[in-house]
Amino acid sequence: DVCSSDLIMEATTLSEARVYVGTYAKYNNGSLYGAWLDLSDYSDKEEFYEACRELHEDEEDAEYMFQDWENVPEGLIGESWISENFFALRDAVEDLNDTEQEAFFVWCNYKSHDLSEEDADDLIKAFQDEYIGQYDDEEDFATQIVAECYELPDFAETYFDYQRFARDLFMCDYWFDDGFVFRAA
């Protein structure tokens, strides 16, 4: 119900994040030996690095090389580092469904949020304040607003210009990106 802002959202792929962990020494000696580690198995960065140490216990002071990764957003990992904020963000989005998580990253990108620096809980709260839902296009959203918020007689619905109403809504009050509608803040 758009009028009362009681919107239902959907789950997360951060829970499926994984990293292939090798070392620079092995790589420089022609070996790609390593293993895929599921980040959901670790509560924080320190636990993850402990698993890396165990995996490469044959090396003293191993320099870990993250040779590949899946479901880790840009800016939270590189070849030789992983952001502490990944684990906080993963935990913060735990209650979001897949659709909401996708919308969250669209929102973060549109707003140019730095996922490696900003507080994960604050990001989720701000996202939830602005997220409306998933729609085919701006006119689809405008049609729903009219249906839920205005009691137009049946004959008037056929004359209502949903396209212009959508244009007006998205001029200042809302924005649309990649199938998602957000409140302009």
Regions found by a protein language model. Name each.
Residues 39-42, 135, 159:
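Conserved aromatic
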Residues 12, 17, 70-81, 95-102, ...:
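Non-transmembrane, interaction-prone alpha-helical and coil segments associated with secretion
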Residues 8-58:
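N-terminal ordered "arm"
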Residues 16-22, 34-38, 63-67, 173-184:
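Ordered hydrophobic segments in well-structured contexts
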